[in-house]
Curated annotation (Swiss-Prot):
Homology family: Belongs to the protein kinase superfamily. Ser/Thr protein kinase family.
Pfam families referenced in this protein's UniProt entry, alphabetically: WH2 (PF02205)
UniProtKB keywords: Glycoprotein, Membrane, Transmembrane, Transmembrane helix
Organism from which the protein derives: Dictyostelium discoideum
Glycosylation sites: N358, N440, N449, N453, N456, N464, N470, N477, N483
Domain Protein kinase: 166-346
Domain-related comment: The protein kinase domain is predicted to be catalytically inactive.
Subcellular location: Membrane
Protein name: Probable inactive serine/threonine-protein kinase slob2
Location of region: Disordered: 366-386, 450-574
């Protein structure tokens, strides 16, 4: 028995030694293979060689772009940080500033390519200036990380941003998983640790204040996640809000597409960040929102998450309502901005276009391609906005308002919403004319059928306007006298295309109507003509008949009417 026992032990030992030798040989071969240069050994390896060469050339091109850009700025390139973020096409570099304090010199520069089909006009200098101004305007808020430098390289279609690097804490995701910020992204989030309840409450309230500030200023974000929240000495700073202006896909885009109709995107993103802080890991997929919250989550945080993901009676909760909940309301901050930001019309147009583009991208059920032509363009958005402003003017043609006298020409046009002038012609409906009737309606021409009374009234008014203020007491009697004498002799107006002829003066002959008198050049009325005893000559179609009829008019023949002055105060007799 002992003989067989020794044989078994020797066989096992020999097998173990042989296995160890094989493992060592394989590892040595693997390390030697990695040290060898990338050369094609046979025809089957040509594709692999070309692929590796393209990757190497791409990295060299990225480094060259970074060096060329930083050549004319105040920063100097230090090194490239490999596999720093979750985006494969976004490259990070360590950058040194020129400050005397070494702790302030540590910077992170990010370079990300932008699609050529993205319609926001960043290729022009005016568009880049507007983009920088919008991004820099948020530096007044204490919970927003504003980049030290933000720019766009039109030749390379690459966006550049430089931010301070918080080496102690890093991002909120680094703070949750207790990992080093500069570790490779695939290796530093293996451990899962949940934060303290008080820290979750404090960080959550700080993020809420920043989101409410952006919401009140109609600022597009859509990119909230724990990796885009920086931690600096127990203070959370949201960052990377410029991604929405560059057409980058948000990390939570699948969640937003799934629950876009039920939950606001910013509220949903905040709920996912709160879930990661309280549970220690990121929510896996959009369908996990409808599943019950884990048992190890804090009870107070559970109430907030249920209010976000499972709203009461289907009413979605807002950011302001979340900030008033007991879990966040007891935190008070004194350094919040009190005044609102003001933006120019160009800046507001760019922000509105970014919001519409991102909402269109996130409202589709399937992920659109970068070359998808169904994505709305900036020209279409401007056309829609212009069409919305001109809704009122589509049913009316732009018509200039005409005036008979010189005094009404200055204020004769009334603009509507589209900037067109509205004419009081008979082509418009009568109820529309009643709404836009000017104050001095007798000075404007109407193409509708008028009666002789209105014509005579305008004639008597034009006659009486030639007198001075000394004969104002006889105005009413003159009007009645002219109406009674000319009602039977005036012929009806001749229908003619616009502009219509002026009403004829009172005359006993049935000749053609004389032309209207020229408008006076002075603003005041002319002096009254001297009375004449000669009878007025008959109207022969010339201006002489009208002038002689006006000169023959005498105010001495008018009778003064007795008027009762009721403008004074009423006194009671004792």
């Amino acid at each position: 028995m002992e003989y067989y026992y020794y044989i078994i032990i020797a066989a096992v030992g020999g097998f173990a030694i042989l296995t160890f030798i094989i493992i060592v040989v394989l590892r040595l071969k693997k390390s030697q293979k990695m040290r060898e240069p990338l050369l094609p050994k046979e025809k089957g390896n040509v594709f692999v060689y070309k692929r590796d060469t393209q990757v190497q050339e791409k990295e060299e091109q990225v480094m060259m772009n970074a060096r060329l850009y930083l050549r004319s700025t105040i920063y100097s390139l230090q090194d490239k940080i490999p596999k720093f973020g979750s985006r494969s096409d976004k490259v990070y570099f360590g950058v040194l500033g020129n400050s005397l304090n070494k702790l302030e010199n540590d910077r992170i520069m990010a370079m990300v390519p932008v699609s050529k089909h993205w319609p926001i006009p960043l290729n022009s200098e005016a568009g880049r200036t507007t983009f920088r101004t919008i991004i820099k305007s948020l530096e007044i808020h204490p919970f927003i990380s504003v980049p030290l430098l933000v720019d766009f390289i039109p030749e390379k279609h690459v966006a550049v941003s430089v931010r301070p690097f918080y080496a102690d804490r890093g991002s909120l995701r680094d703070f949750i998983h207790k990992s080093k910020p500069k570790m490779p992204y695939a290796d530093k989030y293996d451990t899962h640790l949940q934060l303290n309840e008080k820290i979750v409450s404090k960080f959550g309230r700080q993020i809420l204040e920043a989101l409410i500030f952006l919401k009140n200023h109609n600022f597009p974000y859509f990119h909230l996640n724990s990796a885009n929240v920086l931690v600096d000495d127990q203070i959370c700073l949201i960052s990377d809000y410029e991604n929405s202006f560059l057409g980058l896909e948000p990390r939570f885009s699948d969640f937003i597409r799934q629950h876009n109709e039920k939950i606001d995107p910013d509220v949903l993103s905040f709920g996912l960040v709160l879930f990661e802080m309280a549970c220690g890991y990121e929510m896996e997929n959009p369908h996990s929102v409808d599943i019950s919250i884990p048992a190890h989550c804090y009870p107070e945080v559970r109430k907030v998450l249920e209010a976000i993901f499972k709203p009461f009676y289907g009413t979605p909760i807002t950011l302001e309502e979340l900030s008033k909940m007991d879990f966040f309301s007891y935190h008070k901050f004194k350094n919040l901005p009190l005044h609102r930001l003001t933006y120019t019309s160009r800046e507001r147009d760019m922000m509105d276009a970014v919001i519409k583009l991102n909402k269109t991208f996130l409202s589709t059920n399937s992920k659109p391609n970068s070359k998808d032509l169904s994505q709305p363009k900036l020209k279409d958005l401007k056309k829609q906005k212009k069409r919305k402003q001109l809704v009122f003017t589509q049913s009316f043609e732009p018509i200039k308002m005409e005036s008979q006298n010189g005094g009404g020409a200055a204020g004769g046009e009334y603009g509507n919403e589209g900037g067109y002038a509205i004419s009081t012609s008979s082509s418009l409906p009568s109820n529309f004319l009643a709404n836009v009737k000017p104050a001095n309606s007798t000075s404007y021409s109407l193409l509708s059928n008028t009666t002789t009374n209105t014509t005579n009234t305008s004639t008597s008014s034009s006659l009486n306007s030639s007198f001075n203020s000394n004969v104002s007491t006889s105005y009413s009697n003159a009007t009645t006298t002219t109406n009674t004498t000319s009602a039977s002799s005036v012929s009806p107006p001749i229908s003619s295309p616009p502009p219509p002829p002026p009403p004829p003066p009172p005359s006993k002959s049935s000749g053609p109507p004389p032309p209207p008198p020229p408008p006076p050049k002075s603003s005041g009325p002319p002096p009254p003509p001297p009375p004449k005893s000669s009878p007025p000559p008959p109207a022969d179609g010339s201006r002489k008949g009208l002038l002689s009829s006006i000169e023959s008019f005498s105010s001495s023949k008018l009778k003064k009417t007795k008027t009762v002055d009721k403008s004074g105060p009423l006194l009671k007799k004792s």
